[in-house]
């Protein structure tokens, strides 16, 4: 998996940056501590690694790991103070009429195995995601950039669902337009549904 050097994007004495494949956890999820993860696969080759941020199991893309405590602390501070811009690209089922829009609906992360995250105006925590359309396709699909300014589990998927869209290959989240977003963004559904064998969400 990481034997392919093309998945090692950057390495020095302080950092390791890799392209994490879809279907691989960043670290154990608490339900199965022995399961294979990005860190467990990388540490035999690169030594002890500190997790700076996580990518959901289904999400592929750029994963940054620290190679010492000081670097880990410094990078954590940068992420916490929003000095690091996070951007994801996704393939959505449907075409929004707006080129960009914001979702600022509070999220409640459930603690079950699926980690299903829902919109909850009472118990949810403040969350914000900016969406912008990269391209629209005649098949009724669109390529969208998502920039989450908070970092909750499945935040992009939950906020996209509230926008009336879902990600190709997502078995968990289906479109459920929230009234506040439905007034801003109108969705043209896809002409035909395609089958994706993975979640089409990539950390850019």
Residue map of PLM features:
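RNA pseudouridine synthases
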Residues: 1-204
